[in-house]
Amino acid sequence: MKILVIDDEPVVLNSCRKVLEEDGFDVYLVPSADKALKAMKRGGIDLLLVDVKMPKHDGIYLMQKVKEQWPDVPIIVMSGYPTPDTITDGDKMGAAAFIAKPFTPDELLETIRQVIKKEVYHGKK
């Protein structure tokens, strides 16, 4: 499974890469919404981990663009600012799950497993 991680914080990107690669996932890292859209156009991405707060275009903007072109790709929203509005915005845009930063490796993996299980159950993957 190929996971695209989008976050403007290198520490978060590298931490996610380490955890996910150790668990057998193929991981691609990008620091912005624009680069994420370019990566999506190349194809083959199965799941996105998207930070909400990023410069230029935020995660909600990215989710909107992804859902327009790739509606079946599940998106997990990450945020260091888990307000009710952030969660509601993610839900409105079709987020498969939400995870608050900082998160543990186990929390990240469990969230991803739950999303994969839900996608398989609903016949999307």
Annotate the PLM regions.
Residues 13, 55, 83:
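The feature encodes the CheY-like receiver
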Residues 10-28:
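Two-component/phosphorelay signaling modules centered on CheY-like receiver
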